[in-house]
């Protein structure tokens, strides 16, 4: 990727790239250990917080909200908000990994659209390397999920497990933050888009998050359901939305 002209700018500052690679390796190792030995949920959560902090520490942070240019307010708040979002998305994706092909299919669709738009956005606005970084991550996810999905389709011959689902969630969160958290709404004005056109311009960027709305809702309901019953929030059950839809036929 470093030899492709469009992606060369990403490697000009190796810090974020190395942090993402290191975080990916760590979360895969923890996921594999969990798949083998069923680690306590506190260990998994600690690992998720650690990898999220590593990525945020190297500058991939939510600095502003794209609509209206609202800034987060302080470096500490930006750091903590980034960690929260990454951990939230990782667990939301992990929680929907209950049916053959579900995570790989959702990721393939959302990141396919995300890749096209982030690439076009990078070309039109001449942005910083964070736009190109988002495109690179989306391209990696599209390729990985497209290659994995045929083997994970019902009846699956390969399973993603916690190692795969947490990795997909991590990369999806980082790619989304790299664009939406670093974007300058003024750049759209420079290319002729007025304020009334900002929302349509950002809709494709928000598509991956829109697709994750259902997993996030399922994650929230699952945590509330399990905690209220005095169980670990990571205890498996068959009350997820996709299980209920499957039972309904």
Functional labels for PLM-detected ranges:
Residues 27-37, 88-98, 154:
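Membrane-water interface regions at transmembrane-helix termini and the short interhelical loops
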Residues 32, 61-68, 98, 154-156, ...:
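Glycine-rich, flexible loop/turn motifs
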Residues 60-65, 87-92, 122, 177-180:
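Short, highly charged low-complexity linear segments
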Residues 76-99, 140:
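Hydrophobic, membrane-embedded alpha-helices of multi-pass small-molecule transporters
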